[in-house]
Swiss-Prot record:
The lineage of its organism: Eukaryota, Viridiplantae, Streptophyta, Embryophyta, Tracheophyta. It is found in: Nucleus. GO terms for molecular function: methyltransferase activity; RNA binding. The active site is at C89. This is tRNA (cytosine(38)-C(5))-methyltransferase 2. Interacts with type-2 histone deacetylases (AtHD2s) HDT1, HDT2 and HDT3. It catalyses: cytidine(38) in tRNA + S-adenosyl-L-methionine = 5-methylcytidine(38) in tRNA + S-adenosyl-L-homocysteine + H(+). Residues 15-383 form the SAM-dependent MTase C5-type domain. GO terms for cellular component: nucleus. Specifically methylates cytosine 38 in the anticodon loop of tRNA(Asp). Represses gene expression at transcription level, probably by regulating histone deacetylation and epigenetic regulatory network.
């Protein structure tokens, strides 16, 4: 295998890649951003609307069959060097039932693990992304056991966009696996779970599991993050200046898409209704254009305001936060384009017009951070 690897590098052949649970293309955008010479030979995704978005941007429609119906022979025909996987996270979330492998949504990933030893050419590399909590699940135990038996070496990470200069708190679990004799560039990190991206940049001052950054470490991270205003498509306004939002609207219009769920064609339709502010104001996470941290956007953003993502104050008060009247801060939702910006999607990414606003937020909430995944993939493919 090492000779084949050397031959590939010398001949500059593109890596052949399979993309599982492709969604709206976050993994593929990460692969492109990494600079790796590669070719996605097939993508797999069961969601029809997500495939519409993927096809719109990549001119290729993913295979839409059930992954559980795949056989080892099916996978062999792709002759892929690497498998990239972002399986459903619901079995492992804190809000979910935490059934782990007992959740039906985990079955397809378990099926893929079962197939690896039966393929004639197992992938040289695997990349798995999931929520924090996956690392303590029985599915994780099954995955590591399978990979170890098949001579894979793993390096695991829990990383957030905040560690890459993006003001977005979205910690996620990542597993990088390479089959012997392929080595990782930093072998000090073999078979460890790290909370630091240092190995990606050739540094060994790693933060291992259980030694997560303290608050002072987080404060230092935020110093290097860009402000929220760099990720906005709609003008931000500060210091109580008049908003470009149409003042004839009081924000009481339903922002949750109950009037056809069409995509707003004017700024005021992203304003948070006063009724929601009065009811849920204390539970809202408010950020400002100069903020350096934004909460994770979930698939329920725009449908619910509690715990689904940050809201932007379009009028910045003299005193920030809930001490000031929230209704006077003209809170609005971040637009889908802005959420895509926080996920570091490229400027040319777009949704087909028929995809509703709720669908856009839901798909973005299920996606991943290109800013985090691209350097991880670069590190994985680097020999």
């Amino acid at each position: 295998m090492a000779e084949q690897e050397l031959q590939r590098i010398n001949e500059k052949k593109p890596w052949q890649v399979l993309e599982f649970y492709s969604g709206i293309g976050g993994m593929r955008y990460s692969l492109m951003a990494s600079g790796i010479v590669s070719e996605v030979v097939e993508a797999f995704e069961i969601n029809d609307s997500a495939n519409d978005v993927y096809q719109h941007n990549f001119k290729h429609r993913p295979y839409q069959g059930n992954i559980q119906s795949l056989t080892a022979a099916d996978l062999d025909k792709y002759n892929a060097d690497a498998w990239l996987l972002s399986p459903p996270c619901q079995p492992y979330t804190r809000q979910g039932l935490q059934k782990h492998s007992g959740d039906a949504r985990a079955f397809s990933f378990l099926r893929i693990l079962e197939l690896i030893p039966h393929t004639t050419k197992p992938p040289q590399m695997l990349f798995v992304e999931n929520v924090v909590g996956f690392e303590t699940s029985d599915t994780h135990m099954e995955m590591i056991g399978t990979l170890t038996k098949l001579d894979y070496v793993t390096q695991e990470f829990i990383l957030s966009p905040l560690q890459f200069g993006v003001p977005y708190s979205r910690p996620r679990y990542f597993c990088l696996a390479k089959r012997k004799p392929l080595p990782f560039k930093s072998q000090h990190s073999n078979n460890k779970l790290l909370w630091s991206p240092d190995p990606l940049y050739g540094r060994d001052d790693q933060v291992e599991f259980g030694k997560c950054q303290a608050e002072e470490g987080l404060d230092k991270l935020l110093e290097f993050c860009k402000p929220v205003e760099k990720f906005l498509e709609l003008a931000a306004h500060v210091d109580g200046e008049p908003s470009s939002v149409d003042d004839s609207e009081n924000g009481s219009k339903d922002c949750c898409g109950q009037e056809g769920d069409s995509v707003p064609d004017s700024v005021h339709q992203y304003l948070v209704p006063v009724s929601l502010i009065e009811r849920w104001g204390n539970a809202m996470d408010i950020v400002y254009p100069d903020s350096k941290r934004c909460c994770c956007f979930t698939k329920s953003y725009y449908r619910y305001v509690k715990g689904t993502g940050s809201l932007l104050a379009t009028v910045q008060p003299k005193i920030k936060g809930k001490e000031s009247c929230l209704k006077e801060q003209r809170l609005r939702y971040f637009t889908p384009r802005e959420v895509a910006n926080f996920h570091s999607f490229p400027e040319d990414f777009e949704f087909p017009k028929h995809i509703s606003l709720r669908q856009r937020y839901a798909m973005l909430g299920n996606s991943l951070s290109v800013a985090v995944v691209a350097p991880l993939l670069r590190y994985l493919f680097d020999s």
